[in-house]
Swiss-Prot record:
This is S-adenosylmethionine:tRNA ribosyltransferase-isomerase. Transmembrane segments: none annotated. Signal peptide: none annotated. Its EC number is 2.4.99.17. The keyword GTP-binding does not apply. It catalyses: 7-aminomethyl-7-carbaguanosine(34) in tRNA + S-adenosyl-L-methionine = epoxyqueuosine(34) in tRNA + adenine + L-methionine + 2 H(+). GO terms for biological process: queuosine biosynthetic process; tRNA wobble guanine modification. Gene3D superfamilies: QueA-like (3.40.1780.10). It comes from Shewanella loihica (strain ATCC BAA-1088 / PV-4). Keywords: Cytoplasm, Queuosine biosynthesis, S-adenosyl-L-methionine, Transferase. Belongs to the QueA family. Disulfide bonds: none annotated. Its main location: cytoplasm.
Length: 345
């Protein structure tokens, strides 16, 4: 298949640049992968979509304030976007500057902190903090929330709360697992009260999630790598859920990719997973774990719309997106959501 097969025209006014006042106030489009049927709902109607005994799997990564501004000692301004924290002092980062820094270059950050450029790894720069503080402490003090480019506005104080799930736990993401933004504590409690089980995996979403696919054929695309963890207790819950004839429902494509990465690495019976993953899911992929998913609306020609198309069917997803555009759903990170069931192969 070609990348252009996943293109669609989206009116600019449908790109959500701010979240709804309340997390659960978004709309929810349901898509039955087998029939292709769609229905317009409110997000709180998700309680009707799930059954007692189902297992909902969330990504508990925490978004770090990964965008930092500074300048070289020579005076040239630059912008740093953290891709990954290597340890308490070192990061891999994208650096925007009129001239790329060379190894040994000292970078002066806002707040009076300094970093040294150690090495370049392809498009990424390895930087080391020259301070007794940790990278995380410095980012929390002077960093900005790394809003996606299409939101097209500076970050605001409110984004520190709203571009973050209520159940975030493990710092490391530079983009939010956006399907989870629709859940508040009351909705999570209502799900548990209904008898729905919940579990948490971790995938630290990288800045590569915003990079466009730059090849014509999807087979030529190389995915960026991200760190993911599926703990043993989650594996046990999945096995118990399947054995009871209930469904595993992934909240977000990052949860899907975490679970399917674990299945792929296990080569048989599902096992715990803690490693980098560059899994690329596109039509033709056979899902091993996930039966249904909650997801936002994704960019044209993105690897995420390819994943959804693999899950629910190419034509079914294309038709659902056209319906969403006609009904003026809000798109992308701060937009509305879908509840999608898997198409039988």
């Amino acid at each position: 298949m070609r990348v252009a097969d996943f293109s669609f025209d989206l009116p600019d006014e449908l790109i959500a640049r701010y979240p709804m006042p309340n997390r659960t106030a978004s709309r929810l489009l349901t898509l039955d992968g087998n029939s292709g049927a769609v229905a317009d709902k409110q997000f709180t109607d998700i309680l009707e979509m799930v059954n007692p005994g189902d297992l909902m799997v969330f990504n508990n990564t925490r978004v770090i304030p990964a965008r930092v501004f500074g300048q070289k000692q020579t005076g040239g301004k630059l912008e740093i976007l953290v891709e990954r924290m290597l340890d308490d002092k070192r990061i891999l980062a994208h650096v925007r500057s009129s001239k790329s820094p060379k190894p040994g270059t000292i970078i002066c950050l806002d707040g009076g902190y300094e970093m040294t450029m150690l090495a370049r790894h392809d498009t990424l720069f390895e930087l080391e903090l020259n301070s007794e503080s940790t990278i995380l402490e410095v980012l929390e003090e002077v960093g900005h929330m790394p809003l996606p480019p299409y939101i097209d506005r500076p970050d605001e104080d409110a984004d520190k709360e709203r571009y973050q799930t209520v159940y975030n736990q493990n710092p490391g993401a530079v983009a939010a697992p956006t399907a989870g933004l629709h859940f508040d504590d009351a909705l999570l409690a209502a799900l548990k009260e209904k008898g729905v089980n919940v579990a948490f995996v971790t995938l630290h979403v990288g800045a590569g999630t915003f990079q466009p696919v730059r090849v014509d054929s999807i087979l030529d695309h190389k995915m960026h790598s991200e760190w993911a963890e599926v703990p043993q207790d989650v594996v046990d819950s999945i096995k118990a859920t399947k054995a009871a004839g209930n469904r595993v429902i992934a909240v977000g494509t990052t949860s899907v990719r975490s679970l399917e990465s674990a299945a792929k690495a296990s080569e048989g019976e599902l096992q715990a997973y803690s490693n980098d993953t560059d899994i690329f899911i596109y039509p033709g992929y056979e899902f091993q774990v996930v039966d249904a998913m909650v997801t936002n609306f994704h960019l044209p020609e993105s690897t995420l719309i390819m994943l959804i198309s693999a899950f629910a069917g190419f034509d079914e997803v294309k038709n659902a997106y056209q319906h969403a555009i006609a009904q003026k759903y809000r798109f992308f990170s701060y937009g509305d959501a879908m509840f999608v069931t898997k198409k039988a192969i």
